Amino acid sequence: MTALTDIVPPGVVTGDNLLKLLEHARDNGYAIPAVNCTSSSTANACLEAAAKNNSPVIIQVSNGGGAFLVGKSIKDANAAAAGSVALAYHVRAVAKYYGVPVVLHSDHCAKKLLPWFDGMLEADEEYYKMFGEPLFSSHMLDLSEEPDEENIDICVKYFKKMAPMKIWLEMEIGITGGEEDGVNNEDVDPEKLYTTPEQVYSVYEALSKIGPMFSIAAAFGNVHGVYKPGNVKLSPEKLLTHQEYTKEKIGSSLERPIFLVMHGGSGSTDDEIKLAVSNGVIKMNIDTDTQWAYWDGLRIFEAAKHDYLQGQIGNPEGDDKPNKKQYDPRTWVRKAEESMTARVALSMEKLGSVGTYPKSSEPGSQQVLGKKVNVVDGVISAVKGLLPH
Ligand SMILES: [Zn+2]
């Protein structure tokens, strides 16, 4: 196995490095968790999980997440784009300190939300002019509600705009059940919850003419959100049929020529996840489970410290004792973060990404652009350069 550390630098990865990262996942049979983030706090919790588990991570923002990030009081047509860009800048500013590859992605964009997508693309273009790479690594278009032909046409139109900046496109075809971001598929005909190999191939055919950097979320009985077990029949074995069909059509030497993405994975069994990954899933979305984890950390903290959280002064240790340490947001938000970090780590374990990006164990060394650089040596040679010869 080629070491990921030798081919992909730490920090936000875009373009060729992103392609290398996802090819590495495909070729080595693991997937990367993509976690919906709605704040700097939740983003940091993901970065912490990635750093502690030597794993790459995908941080993604939804339209609703973007609108929340800008501030709920702001009612502006560009609010969601502005908030999404703000999260991207936050992640860009801090990612390098965590020492692992980070993918910046935007989640489901239905037809009515295209102005949000356009706003983020504008930010990508601006960033590209300044730094020669886009702000985001990747964006998702979800036109699965539209007829297939229109879905694919719109994806082609956008992918042509994105390809020159080497931005990844994730698209969805077929119906994922449940409800997310205002799209409600709760009462859909169960037969329609499975994308066919022909549908997947038609996407491959259209997008591969433009570039290799795209992935497909094909429905295989997945449902957004958490449902009672038994209500959904997940069929990850169908994903292999997609791979085989396209492989045959294009005569590919790759066993799994298509990058697949798993949505609606909350509540899936470990075996279902494993089978999906072995059939070419390289990214799995996580939202519902990490939302719960974030809340659960706070819930447990409040239950344990309840009597210290009822007023600014006065607790079981005395009527005049201050409680500032307990109600400082850095205390209780941190509890939420720790709980979410642990949940993201669990997903990394299930998806097999743990340990794929080992940081150097040599003291004082860190990775810069994939090369191990000894910080002490670097400082010594810099100091030597300053001394008179
Ligand atoms: Zn989806």
What are these regions (language model features)?
Residues 34-36, 58-60, 103-105:
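Short, conserved beta-strand segments within well-ordered enzyme catalytic domains
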Residues 1-33, 252:
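N-terminal amphipathic alpha-helix/helix-capping segment at the start of soluble metabolic enzymes
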Residues 95-96, 228, 238, 242, ...:
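Catalytic-face loop-and-helix region of soluble metabolic enzyme cores
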Residues 32, 165-172, 210-215, 251-257, ...:
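Flexible, glycine/charged-enriched surface loops at secondary-structure junctions
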Residues 105, 170-172, 261:
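Generic enzyme active-site microenvironment
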Residues 303-389:
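Extended, intrinsically disordered, low-complexity segments
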Residues 16-24, 40-78, 82-99, 110-256, ...:
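Alpha/beta enzyme core
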Residues 10, 35-38, 106, 144, ...:
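Glycine- and other small-residue-rich loops at beta-strand/loop junctions that grip anionic moieties
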